[in-house]
């Protein structure tokens, strides 16, 4: 099981500094969509140049022009790139092919997918490296949790890894870990904590069953 830190609401310099502080506890650091919108792919490059061992994920939420956008993210140092599960099959296949051509990975974000079970099966067959169930900010505000979606996707896929994101914090991560996902994505639960290092440490301990 891997741990990913998602950073959304900082600038690229602040994001790199936070990543440096917690890197020993996380496997992947994500430059979130808001940072990409504000600062572009150079934010991915800046992070890549300032951390040592963690992989870098560029949360582009690709919807079209998939092979080009994956290639650009990879050029700027991304190890993993995201595409939306509601994108066309042709886009998903092109993104998978482009990522794998460079030895990189593709994460498919299931946000707003209506038929989770069917789409997860299709994405699994298309070669997605990760399928991520994602309760976005707007649904978190309504009290929604990704647990049921996680169970649904885990029950039907054969090859892809399952990732889970959405409001996960150090005090709730054990419920997620109990479902045995391959990747747990924590954003504000670490980034907005009074002590981000301690929060990351607690999340890592939960993942390792300590």
Swiss-Prot record:
Q: Tell me the route in metabolism or biology where this protein functions.
A: One-carbon metabolism; formaldehyde assimilation via RuMP pathway; D-fructose 6-phosphate from D-ribulose 5-phosphate and formaldehyde: step 1/2
Reactions listed under catalytic activity: D-ribulose 5-phosphate + formaldehyde = D-arabino-hex-3-ulose 6-phosphate
The top EC class is: lyase
GO MF terms on file? 3-dehydro-L-gulonate-6-phosphate decarboxylase activity; hexulose-6-phosphate synthase activity; orotidine-5'-phosphate decarboxylase activity
This protein's record includes keyword Membrane: no
Q: Which domain of life is it from?
A: Bacteria
This enzyme's EC code(s): 4.1.2.43
UniProt-listed InterPro entries? 3-hexulose-6-phosphate_synth (IPR017553), Aldolase_TIM (IPR013785), HPS/KGPDC (IPR041710), OMPdeCOase_dom (IPR001754), RibuloseP-bd_barrel (IPR011060)
Keyword annotations for this protein? Carbohydrate metabolism, Lyase, One-carbon metabolism
Membrane-traversing stretches: none
Pfam families named in the record? OMPdecase (PF00215)
Q: Which GO terms describe its biological process?
A: 'de novo' pyrimidine nucleobase biosynthetic process; formaldehyde assimilation via ribulose monophosphate cycle; L-ascorbic acid catabolic process; one-carbon metabolic process
Looking up CDD domains in the UniProt record yields: KGPDC_HPS
NCBIfam families assigned to the protein according to its UniProt record, in alphabetical order? RuMP_HxlA
The UniProt entry's sequence similarity note says: Belongs to the HPS/KGPDC family. HPS subfamily.
Kindly give the PANTHER family that the UniProt entry links to this protein: 3-KETO-L-GULONATE-6-PHOSPHATE DECARBOXYLASE SGBH-RELATED
The UniProt function text for this chain reads: Catalyzes the condensation of ribulose 5-phosphate with formaldehyde to form 3-hexulose 6-phosphate.
Q: Write down what this protein is called.
A: 3-hexulose-6-phosphate synthase
| Organism, as annotated | Staphylococcus epidermidis (strain ATCC 35984 / DSM 28319 / BCRC 17069 / CCUG 31568 / BM 3577 / RP62A)
